[in-house]
Amino acid sequence: MNLAAMDPTTYDAQLTAKRIKLEQAFAQFETPSVEVFASEPAHYRMRAEFRVWHEGDDLYYYMFDKVLNDKVRCDQYLPASALINQMMAALITELKPNHSLRHKLFQVDFLSTLSGEILVSLLYHRQLDDQWRSEAAALKARLSSQFKVNIIGRARKQKIDLDKDFVVESLQVNDKVFHYKQIENSFTQPNAKVAIKMLEWAIDVTQNSQGDLLELYCGNGNFSIALAQNFNRVLATELAKPSVDAAQYNIEVNNIDNLQIIRMSAEEFSDAMAKKRSFRRLEGIDLDSYVCNTIFVDPPRAGIDPATLELVRGYERILYISCNPDTLKDNLQQLNQTHKVTRFALFDQFPYTDHMETGVLLERR
C-alpha cells in the first residue's frame, strides 16, 4: 500500500499512464484501441482488511505503508466504500471499552455491498468463548440499528457465525439486476462499479453468439450468470467448494435455467474433454452434447497452464479476463498464432496501484 499515491486529483493522469503502458506492452499483437473503463476515484473498494493496534486504552486500525516502511493509522480509508468507512468508526467506538471483544483482537475484515449489506470479521490470537459470543451478539444488536450487519469471529481452527457468513450483492447490469451471494473469505470482485462495467462489456462482446459457452474458473458464477442470456447453454467449472455452493445459490436466485456448474479444476476438465480421464462428477452430463463455440476464461494470476491453453485454442472465440498482464502476454504468444485480438479493454479495478485488469476477445484467424 502507498497512501501518498491515493490522491483523487491525480486519478485521471494515473489511469492515462496505465493505458499507455498497456498499449505499449501489447503493441506486438496489433490490438484494436484499448477501451478504458474508469473507477470512482474514491470509496470504490467493497472490501478492506485492517490490522488492529493496541496502545493502552486506545485501539485503532492500521495498514503497512510500503513506501514509508512503517504502519499507518487508518481511522478512515479513502479507497473503501462509504459503508465500510461508516462501520469503521462505529465499530471501533464499540470495541474500545469492551475487554471481551478487544482482547487479543489483531485484525478486522470488512465486506460490503452496493445493496447495503456489510459483513465484519473479527480475528483473534485466542480461542473465543461464550462470553465473547454473548458480547458479539449484543454488539450486532446495537450496530443493527444503523447497519444491515453480520459479525463473524475467527481464531485458530475456530469460526463463529452469529447469523450468516455471506452478503448478497445486487448489481444493475444494463436493464437487469443480478443478485450474487458473496461468502466471507472467498474471492469477490473488490470494485463493484467496475465489476458492473466488466459484465456489461462481456455481454456486449458476446452479443449474437451462436451455440453454447464454456467457462473455466467461474467462481461464484459472476460472469456465467450474466452471460447466460447470450447463449443456448452455459457449462462452467470451478474447483473451490464454497464458490461452487455460492454459484448454485446464485443460479437459483437469478432464475437461470441454462447454466450447469461442475466442481473440477481447469486441468481436470481439459483431461475430461480429451478423454484422458473419467470423473464421477461428470456422471449425467453429456459433454459431447454441448456445442461450445465460445470459451470464457478468468484465470488466477499465474495465467492458463499449458494443457488448458491447448484446450482453449480449440474454440472459435476466446473471451479472456486477466488480472495479470504479464501472464496474459505470455498466453497471447501462443493464442496469437491461431487467433486475433478483436476487442481489448482496461478495467481499473485497483486505482492508485500498478495493477491492471484487462479483457481480451480473440477470434480464430
Curated annotation (Swiss-Prot):
This molecule's function is given as: Dual-specificity methyltransferase that catalyzes the formation of 5-methyluridine at position 54 (m5U54) in all tRNAs, and that of position 341 (m5U341) in tmRNA (transfer-mRNA).
Which annotated residues bind S-adenosyl-L-methionine? Answer: Q189, Y217, N222, E238, D298
Q: PANTHER family, from UniProt?
A: TRNA/TMRNA (URACIL-C(5))-METHYLTRANSFERASE (PTHR47790), TRNA_TMRNA (URACIL-C(5))-METHYLTRANSFERASE (PTHR47790:SF2)
Instruction: Name the Gene3D superfamilies on file.
Output: 2.40.50.1070, Vaccinia Virus protein VP39
Q: What is the lineage of its organism?
A: Bacteria, Pseudomonadati, Pseudomonadota, Gammaproteobacteria, Alteromonadales
Keywords linked to the UniProt accession: Methyltransferase, S-adenosyl-L-methionine, Transferase, tRNA processing
Question: Which organism was this protein described from?
Answer: Shewanella sp. (strain ANA-3)
Q: Which PROSITE patterns match?
A: SAM_MT_RNA_M5U, TRMA_1, TRMA_2
- Indicate what this protein is called per its UniProt record: tRNA/tmRNA (uracil-C(5))-methyltransferase
Q: What is its EC number?
A: 2.1.1.-, 2.1.1.35
GO MF term set: rRNA binding; tRNA (uracil(54)-C5)-methyltransferase activity, S-adenosyl methionine-dependent; tRNA binding
